Regions:
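Secretory targeting signatures
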Residues: 1-14
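N-terminal leader/targeting pre-sequences
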Residues: 13-169
Length: 169
């Protein structure tokens, strides 16, 4: 079952709302992972990573990625599970950015594109249970509109956990 919404709660390594000058925020961490067929993917120690800060009261986010390939364009997406077919279509584009000479990328925007929520486990993914959205940083060249057409997982950052619907709903 797939559905979309703009309400989101980030459940990650750091639980609970952080209070900042712009109001309550949550954080979602993305990591470089080692793809392992039929097993949970492991986080690459000292690998590329990113942090997404979501400001609920403004439905605004900021993403900062680190240790990326310099001068490479990246796209932050909300990934739609493809079922048992490939490629994954109708992924939500949250923003794009180019890594600077130090391998850092900065992407920010409003959560106006609908985040894609999947019901887990799915035909293609059993690492989670419940409902949530996967957020990935992928190579912009691997996207064709909202379709993730190419697969280069060693070059991507993957969620540390799902973005989940707020518990108030």
């Amino acid at each position: 079952m797939l559905f979309a919404t703009t309400l989101v709660s980030a459940i990650g390594p750091k639980k609970g709302l952080a209070k900042g000058p712009m109001g309550p925020a949550e954080h979602l961490y993305l990591y470089e992972k080692t793809p392992v067929e039929d097993h949970a993917w492991t986080i690459v120690e000292h690998g590329s990573w990113g942090k997404m800060t979501i400001l609920f009261n403004k439905m605004f986010f900021v993403f900062n990625g680190h240790k990326l390939v310099a001068d490479t364009q990246y796209t932050l997406i909300s990934y739609r599970e493809p079922g048992n077919t490939w490629p994954a279509t109708n992924c939500a584009i949250l923003g794009t950015g180019t890594a600077d000479a130090n391998g850092n990328v900065h992407i920010m925007g409003f959560l106006m594109p609908l985040l894609v929520y999947n019901e887990y486990p799915t035909d293609t993914s059993n690492e989670y249970s419940g409902t949530g959205a996967k957020v990935w940083l992928v190579l912009s060249n691997d996207m064709d509109g909202t379709t993730l057409q190419d697969w280069n997982p060693a070059e991507y950052l993957f969620e540390g956990d799902l973005l989940r619907l707020p518990s108030l709903i």
